[in-house]
């Protein structure tokens, strides 16, 4: 069936090229397109932009609720996962727009016929990076030359990267082949909320003496994952149940694995229902593995308590890869 998959990719790429080549002849508009694949990542950026410019949010299925909330504020939205809408509305609009803002890697950008005066900006979906990606992804050695060329065409579509640190700028330069002059050291809009919440916590502590401490567990996504993470929750409940409660937030791609898992007085599996900032604000302790959410938590909490649960470190490092010198930067035990 591999030939069928390759044929589908070829048809997809040719159709994107065909539609965008026709649209690129049109006059460039003042439209700003925001490509959204991560919820709770824009934090007011879209609302601020729409005060002065027409903005259209193109979203993946994981962001449907957030997109619909924006639509109620009179923001134009288009689903990327609807083939008809994608080819006949999204692609032409992206091609004609002066600015395209991206929060992730979007494969179709490599096929898009880009207007010479258009600007594509990568704002990413994380403050920092723990695992490797792009050219540093361990799986790259198993990909074909055609795949590598396709990845490169996507990386080269970005004109600028919004970053909050030199470390993250270095990551993009290694992972996407970006250049230093493409880095915009503005800080990320998504992190403002954590700084504001941190100030509020300092000014007002609302915990009571009988407050049960909250552990938040945020495992990252693993390719092909079909089972829940290996955290020994029954043992935790036995040892900690009197003083703690556990909230699990799975990656959106695997949340369905927990749909039929019962909640107990100790553990709940509905962390995905809360915005990231709100969930982390409640946490007295964060347990994670390779998730970049730890950077958000560190910004939010003055005394951030973190445990890194790397039960599959060797396999993960071999399959995906971890950032160099990572262990020197960790703020908690492994």
Give the positions of each predicted feature.
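N-terminal pre-catalytic "stem/leader" segment of glycosyltransferase-like enzymes
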Residues: 1-89, 99
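Short N-terminal targeting/anchoring amphipathic segment
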Residues: 34-35, 92-108
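Conserved catalytic-core segment of nucleotide-activated headgroup transferases in glycan assembly
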Residues: 41-53, 174-175, 183-260
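Catalytic donor nucleotide-activated moiety binding site of glycosyltransferases and closely related
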Residues: 58-73, 240-270
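Active-site-proximal region of nucleotide-activated glycan assembly enzymes
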Residues: 77, 115-192
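Donor nucleotide-activated moiety binding/catalytic core segment of transferases
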Residues: 81-94, 252-295
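A short beta-strand/loop micro-motif in the catalytic core of glycosyltransferases
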Residues: 100-101, 159-165, 247, 286-287
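Catalytic binding pocket for nucleotide-activated donors in carbohydrate/polymer assembly enzymes
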Residues: 285, 292-334
């Amino acid at each position: 069936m591999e030939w069928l998959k390759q044929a589908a990719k070829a048809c997809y790429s040719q159709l994107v090229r065909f539609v965008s080549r026709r649209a690129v002849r049109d006059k460039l508009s003042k439209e700003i397109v925001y490509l959204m694949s991560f919820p709770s990542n824009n934090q007011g950026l879209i609302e601020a932009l729409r005060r002065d410019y027409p903005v259209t949010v193109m979203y993946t299925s994981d962001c449907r609720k957030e997109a619909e909330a924006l639509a109620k504020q009179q923001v134009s939205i288009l689903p990327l996962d609807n083939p008809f809408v994608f080819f006949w509305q999204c692609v032409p609009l992206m091609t004609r727009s002066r600015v395209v803002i991206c929060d992730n890697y979007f494969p179709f950008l490599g096929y898009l016929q880009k207007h010479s005066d258009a600007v594509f900006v990568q704002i990413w979906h994380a403050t920092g990076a723990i695992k490797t990606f792009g050219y540093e992804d361990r799986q790259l050695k198993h990909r074909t030359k055609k795949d590598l060329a396709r990845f490169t065409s996507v990386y080269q579509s970005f004109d600028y990267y919004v970053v909050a640190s030199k470390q993250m700028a270095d990551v993009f330069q290694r992972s996407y082949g970006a250049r230093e002059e493409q880095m915009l050291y503005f800080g990320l809009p998504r992190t403002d909320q954590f700084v504001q919440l941190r100030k509020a916590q300092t000014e007002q502590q609302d915990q009571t003496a009988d407050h049960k401490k909250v552990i938040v567990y945020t495992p990252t996504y693993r390719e092909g994952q079909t089972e829940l993470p290996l955290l020994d929750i029954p043992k935790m409940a036995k040892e900690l149940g009197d003083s703690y409660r556990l909230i699990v937030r799975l990656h959106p791609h695997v949340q369905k694995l927990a749909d039929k898992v019962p909640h107990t007085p100790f553990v709940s599996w509905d962390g995905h229902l809360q915005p990231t900032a709100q969930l982390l604000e409640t946490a007295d302790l964060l347990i994670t593995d390779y998730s970049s959410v730890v950077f958000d938590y560190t910004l939010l909490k003055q005394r951030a308590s973190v445990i890194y649960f790397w039960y599959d470190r060797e396999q993960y490092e071999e399959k995906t890869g971890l950032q160099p010198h990572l262990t020197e930067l960790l703020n908690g035990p492994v």
